[in-house]
From Swiss-Prot:
Database matches in Pfam families: Kelch_1, Kelch_6
Gene Ontology process terms (BP): negative regulation of cytokinin-activated signaling pathway; regulation of phenylpropanoid metabolic process
InterPro entries listed in its UniProt record: Kelch-typ_b-propeller, Kelch_1, KMD1-4
PANTHER family: GENOME ASSEMBLY, CHROMOSOME: A06 (PTHR46407:SF20), OS02G0208700 PROTEIN (PTHR46407)
Mitochondrion is among the record's keywords: no
One Gene Ontology CC term in the entry: cytosol
Kelch repeat windows: 119-167, 170-217, 219-269, 271-310, 313-358
Name by which UniProt lists this protein: F-box/kelch-repeat protein At1g15670
Length: 359
């Protein structure tokens, strides 16, 4: 059977490669051959190699329209309602994903977002009405534009944990705290394709409010603090090698002193470059030492999310301070210049979490 009748196979395949990710659900419904083709990992490798992939920044972002109000005594406390917004970096277009199943009151607060292949994984968070810790897992497929409910995270309630993915199949989770605010040293891995959780060996120390990245085949957990050191962020880091299934320390001084006042927002590039946004500084690690490579623009210095594009350029999302509009910038590493991304009133709400997806 031909991909497209009366067209050479190479030309027909090129047509599929050039399609927008938003057309994937429609393409999958055309015929089984198209559905199978766009589901193959080779399709996305060819799409990326030919320069037709699309870079997306996916955010847990508050709605800007009138917020839902929670009445407490004589006071009215505004409670932002969060939803998932998508920024297409190539075009600047923004959109919103369908609501997460069973969450008419918005996304769980402080949930974590991770991309795995062409899927988005939403992990845990706090119920926006009761503020109870959730162990829920939801997976959104950009191929079908549908949600599915994943297996709940085991091990009891956990919030403010670090997570990262290998971008292919697995999501790694570590640290955070339980319902009694006790910092945790346990870690888990979630196989998205198999919808299966497994426990990893414990880390070497408790790490609440830590951050994480995945690169060079390792899951790196950075900073955080123990139960007895509430708010005193550690300079240390440790990494989990998926091949040896073991943790190893990254040294007692992985972070510099000025980077422990508040947890840095980190990102790792495909070439191994490691960047961190810390207060007003853009930092880069070279030869195991952090160097300042630039100043963050004033209206984005309260950073919510940072990602490294395939070109090596950085995308930073944030605001001047909490309550101010969220904006985005692209940092060109070739000339160290910042370019402000186009803004839209509808998508200026506070951002709690984000992830990067190339599809």
């Amino acid at each position: 059977m031909e991909l497209i009748p009366d067209l050479p196979e190479t030309v027909a395949y090129e047509c599929l490669l050039r399609s927008s990710y938003k057309q994937f659900p429609l393409m999958a419904s055309v015929c089984k051959l198209w559905q199978r083709e766009i589901s193959l990992s080779d399709f996305f490798r060819h799409r990326k190699a030919s320069g037709h992939s699309q870079e997306l920044v996916v955010l847990s972002q508050a709605r800007v329209d009138p917020v839902k109000e929670l009445v407490s005594g004589n006071k009215t406390i505004p409670t932002p309602v969060y939803r998932i917004s998508v920024l297409e970096l190539g075009t600047g277009l923004r959109s919103e994903l369908p609501p997460v199943p069973g969450h008419s009151n918005g996304l769980p607060l402080f949930c974590r977002l991770v991309s795995v292949g062409s899927d988005l994984v939403v992990l845990c968070g706090l119920d926006p009405v009761t503020w109870r810790t959730s162990d829920s897992v939801f997976v959104f497929s950009f191929l079908t534009s549908t949600w599915r409910v994943g297996k709940s995270m085991p091990g009891g309630p956990r919030s403010f944990f670090a997570c990262a993915s290998d971008s292919q199949r697995n999501v790694f989770v570590a640290g955070g705290h339980d319902e009694d605010k006790n910092a945790m040293m346990s870690a888990l891995v979630y196989d998205v394709a198999e919808d299966r959780w497994a426990f990893l060996p414990d880390m070497g120390r408790e790490r609440d409010e830590c951050t994480a990245i995945f690169h060079a085949g390792k899951f790196h957990v950075i900073g955080g603090y123990s139960t007895e050191e509430q708010g005193q962020f550690s300079k240390t880091a440790e990494s989990f090698d998926v091949t040896t299934w073991r943790w190893s320390p990254q040294g007692e001084e992985f972070l510099s002193s000025e980077m422990t006042m508040w947890p840095p927002i980190c990102a790792a590039g495909e070439n191994g470059d490691l960047y961190a946004c810390c207060r007003r500084d853009l930092m880069m690690m070279k030869d195991d030492t952090w160097y300042k490579v630039g100043n963050l623009p004033a209206d984005v210095c309260n950073v919510s999310y940072v990602a490294i594009r395939r070109s090596g350029n950085l995308v930073v999302i944030g605001s001047a301070r909490y309550g101010e509009p969220s904006v985005g910038y692209n940092w060109d590493m070739s000339n160290s210049r910042w370019l402000k991304l186009e803004t839209h009133d509808k998508y200026e709400g506070h951002v709690q979490a984000g992830c990067f997806l190339e599809i």
